Amino acid sequence: MTGSPPTLPPPPLLPRLVGIGSWAIFLALFLASAHFTNFSLQTLAQGIPDFFAFFGKMWPLDWRALPEIGQPLLETLQIAYLGTLFGGILAIPFIFLGSRNTTANPVVMWGVRGFLTLVRSVPDLLYAAICVGILSFGPLPGVVAIVIFTASVLAKLGSETVEAIDPGPLEALQAVGAGRIQQIVYGVVPQIAATMASYVLYIFEINVRASTVLGFVGAGGIGQLLRTYLSFFDYRSTAVLILIVFGVVLLIDAVSSYARSKLI
């Protein structure tokens, strides 16, 4: 008796339709976005000579700009540091109020989460512009903008970290009658300390980069000097400034990455 090879059933129709539909939606969104943004590969190709011509204006570098770069660069680092420090402190209560396992009232939890989502939806550059209008020009509006951004992001990351902890220590503390604060201090903080320290270092990296452009709206830092150079078409000094900022950010990233690798 000769046996015929088994015939595989055809693949289900619904998953195939879902896959085809997903690709169709993706393609439609791509074409619509390209149309409404006037995206054109031809225009990009035509701009390549201008791109190289722009960078050609930056050579040779004008190293005479170095003395006036130091103070604004230091101010930028101070804005990022203070913003990260105070933002981290401000985030602490929101971390625990926005976590399921540390908040007894779900209304409070969802209220805090909604508030944080609203705060995060506003770009830090817009916060800086608003603070400049309220507090006048200078580094203080930049610090306030970084504080708001840092607090909202760390609170979000922190609440998710708290919800992922081992519930055993919390249950043990509840069993012996520990209060809410004691449960957080002894059952939660030891489990999230290293991860949160890593997040803080990462946010500091982001804040250093963000602080370099806050000066464009008058919020202090090296961004103000960069805007001045560009306004006067001083591309050679602009190149020196960009090179210095790149080196500092690269150094901070390397140190922060090493520190975070030791924490986790």
Language-model-detected regions and their locations in the chain:
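Generic hydrophobic transmembrane alpha-helix motif, especially the helices
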Residues: 116-150
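Glycine-rich helix-loop "coupling/hinge" segments at transmembrane-helix boundaries
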Residues: 133, 208-245, 264
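N-terminal, non-cleaved signal-anchor transmembrane helix
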Residues: 1-85, 92-93, 97, 101, ...
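C-terminal transmembrane helix and the adjacent membrane-cytosol boundary/short C-terminal tail
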Residues: 12, 18-22, 239-264
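Membrane-cytosol interface at the C-terminal ends of specific transmembrane alpha-helices
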Residues: 138-188, 194-203, 254
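Hydrophobic positions within alpha-helical transmembrane segments of bacterial inner-membrane proteins
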Residues: 84-92, 96, 100, 125, ...
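Cytoplasmic-entry segments and transmembrane alpha-helices of multi-pass inner-membrane transporters
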Residues: 94-128, 157-160
